[in-house]
Amino acid sequence: MSIAVPIVLVNMPVSAVERPSLALGLLKSALTQAGLQSTIAYANIWFLEYIGIADYGPLENCPPEEALVDWLFAGIAFPGFEPEQNAFLDLYFERTPIHAGKGMAERRANFLRLRSLIGGFIDWTADKILAKRPAMVGCSSTFTQHVPSLALLRRLSERSLDLVTLMGGANCESVMGRSTHARFPWVDYVVSGEADALIGPLCWDILNRGRDIPPADLPFGVFGPTHREAGYPAASTRDLGSVPK
């Protein structure tokens, strides 16, 4: 039987596979200093193994604004939303001339094939994470990781009702973090801003109180389930000396 790990931090695709995640490494160190056991799951590397480097490379190099990775994972993150696939790919090819011309039909078919594999990948990843019997799972969200992270956390929350989910990273800054939390109820906690100093106490509090932490007890920039009932704080500036004159 595997040994339970209270906290799993997940580095979702699509992100660089040449180096470990500095951000998650810092969080793991902070959790260790707080007396909490955690592990980092490099799901970006699992995805490379799942689809192969020939397909992973172009996804890693695709500009985030093209939303190609979002499109690939959207069917799992938002199962009720099914856009016209060929219309999206037409626009993508139009905006990305490198994919146009000879072989475009094959590239189109390959992207559709990759999209059909995402459900299996998310299930496989969820199996590997749940085997660790975590109490909470946190996903990073930088650049193209946002929708893949939403897809995984949704699947995990469906399969383990007691599991507490967290999200943080550059895509969760300010109003982006608040909007993510408000619109996606399967994400229990969103951390907006640097988490190094607060992650230890926050995770201890979550382990003790689960989803029932009152807004007043949460650190600045952290949104929890109780915010959905009590309301979200108004935007504020902590350091008035930094306000432009």
Task: Cite the ranges covered by each PLM segment.
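Pyridoxal 5′-phosphate
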Residues: 245
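Conserved N-terminal ligand/cofactor-binding loop architecture of enzyme catalytic domains
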Residues: 39-123
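N-terminal pre-triad scaffold of radical SAM enzymes
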Residues: 10-13, 85
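Generic start-of-chain signal for non-secretory N-termini
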Residues: 1-11
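Polynucleotide-recognition surfaces of large bacterial nucleic-acid defense/processing enzymes
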Residues: 236-238
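Glycine-rich beta-alpha loop elements in corrinoid/cobalamin-binding modules
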Residues: 6, 14-17, 21-47, 103, ...
